[in-house]
Regions:
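A short small-residue
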Residues: 65-73, 117, 189
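Helix-loop-beta segment of a Rossmann-like dinucleotide-binding subdomain
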Residues: 74-78, 108-135, 192-196
Length: 268
């Protein structure tokens, strides 16, 4: 069992969001990072394409926002888009300061084009951007004395007292017990395995959303699930994701008859 029962913050999920959350918290806080995996598999680690950010002279925040809103078909949260676009360059700088080395072209960061972007603004580390990102963050986590990273521990319930989340119940091997904290952050990723076909790893089962809903949290926008259109499928093997950068560089989607199944979406 985990030796300490009382923490300042418990972070559930050890993908990019959970790892970065731990690093951004003050070093004065005792942080427990719970990872249901014993291996290093995660959706973040499997991410291929890259990180979109305005860094070129021929680009702008307005263009990036316009592309995003157009791709969202008018359903985007405008404030969220504005935050995403304006804070992206600073996040890229932060990652570089942490030691992430993006691909270079001449004397500047290399950029590629992905679907819906009108400018080349996707920074990458070959086709293993997610892996590079997670490895940099994990290295920093392991060197933080205020952070304990526990693998193979699964959160089964949130502890709610007076309408506040004050801890979690965990399944740790054969042991089921409660851990208290002043705050809990759920960073458990998506729910690809709610569907028959997915390129997500097995732990992408929507557990974080279920935990929050069961605890009484308001859940919204569950209908917005991204369906990635390109994967490689072999009989008896899991689906292998084919990067979105493929289409950004000019590849087109066609069925066995050479017809486009997404023709009606071309305006977006």
């Amino acid at each position: 069992p985990i030796p300490i029962n009382n923490w300042d913050v418990i972070v559930v999920g050890a993908g990019a969001a959970g790892l970065m959350t731990c690093l951004e918290l003050p070093a004065s806080l005792k942080v427990l990072l719970l990872n249901r995996n014993t291996s290093k598999v995660s959706s973040s680690r499997w991410a291929q394409g890259g990180i979109a950010s305005v860094i070129r002279q021929d680009d702008s925040f307005d263009l990036h926002a316009h592309d995003t809103l157009k791709a969202g078909d008018g359903l985007c949260d405008f404030q969220a888009v504005e935050m995403l676009v304006k804070e992206a360059p600073g996040c890229v700088d932060r990652l570089q300061n942490l030691g992430m080395i993006f691909d270079q072209s001449s004397d500047q960061l290399a950029t590629t084009l992905e679907a819906a972007h009108s400018r080349r603004r996707v920074l990458h580390v070959k086709d293993r951007t997610g892996r590079a990102l997670v490895e940099v963050l994990e290295d920093h986590i392991e060197n933080k004395k205020n952070i304990l990273h526990c693998r193979g521990v699964r959160v089964t319930e949130l502890l709610i007292e007076n309408k506040e989340c004050r801890g979690v119940q965990v399944l740790d091997g054969a042991n089921l017990y409660w851990i208290q904290s002043r705050a809990v952050v759920l960073a458990t990723g998506g729910g690809g395995h709610l569907f028959t076909n997915t390129t997500n790893p097995a732990q992408s089962s929507g557990e974080g959303i279920a935990l929050a809903w069961k605890a009484g949290a308001a859940i919204e926008d569950l209908e917005f699930v991204q369906f990635h259109p390109t994967a490689l499928k072999f009989y008896g093997a899991p689906c292998f994701l084919i990067s979105e950068a493929l289409r950004g560089e000019g590849a087109i989607l066609v069925d066995k008859n050479g017809e486009s199944p997404v023709k009606n979406l071309e305006d977006r």
